[in-house]
Amino acid sequence: MTRFFLVRHGETEWNRLRKIQGVSDIPLNDTGRAQAAALGDILSKHSFDLIVSSPLSRAQETARIVAAKLGMPAPLAIHDLIERNYGEAEGSSGAELDTRYPAGVEIPGREDRADVAKRVVRTLHDLAIRHPDADIVVVAHGAVIRSVVEYAAPGEYSEPITNCSVHSFSHVAGELALVAFDDPMEVLSHELADEEFVDQNPAEARESSRG
């Protein structure tokens, strides 16, 4: 059995401002770095075999901070762990999204959710084949993790995926199963933020509300 611990990156300024990031390469802010360090302290109580991440800088920096806390080598960047592409909606706030693309209007260039799930699940499957019986930390993004949760446990979890939260999965005989949404080992990262946590991505929140 291979176990995966999917981690969302730490906070960025666009997260704080509730702007849609997608594949826009927005770095961590100071809160995000503190979240990553706190998560690293918690994960250091456990043993892991490998850390991989999305190629975007917010995920890579989170993964590097965690790897340093664990005394592990620099994480491997895997392109197919990149965040969902939100096309022309990237950089928009919720109000701007509603004005430019009201509910029901297609957002030009937005990646289909099913395509996100396909590439991410394929990546996890490939990692499980190459690293059987390993415990692997995967630092990625909210929509990436959401796609895997929906693949493994469709319709069961609608709660926001917080910065530096951990969601654990098992991979046995080619089957991916959700072990824990918000794994108990995680840091409650919203306690490090200045305001009550709500879903930071208005496009994802709107789509999730429709099922």
Description of each model-found segment:
Residues 45-47, 127-134:
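Glycine-rich phosphate-binding loop signature in dinucleotide/nucleotide-binding domains
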Residues 5-61, 109-121:
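Loop-to-helix element that buttresses phosphate recognition and phosphoryl-transfer chemistry
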Residues 12, 144-145:
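Short active-site segment of divalent metal-dependent hydrolases/proteases
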Residues 4, 134-140:
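Generic beta-sheet signal
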Residues 65, 147, 151:
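Active-site signature of alpha/beta-hydrolase-fold catalytic machinery across serine-
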Residues 97-115, 200-210:
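Short glycine/proline- and acidic residue-enriched helix-loop micro-motifs
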Residues 37-100:
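Phosphate-coordination/substrate-recognition cap region in phosphate-metabolizing enzymes
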Residues 72, 84-95, 150-211:
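Acidic, low-complexity terminal tails and accessory targeting/binding regions
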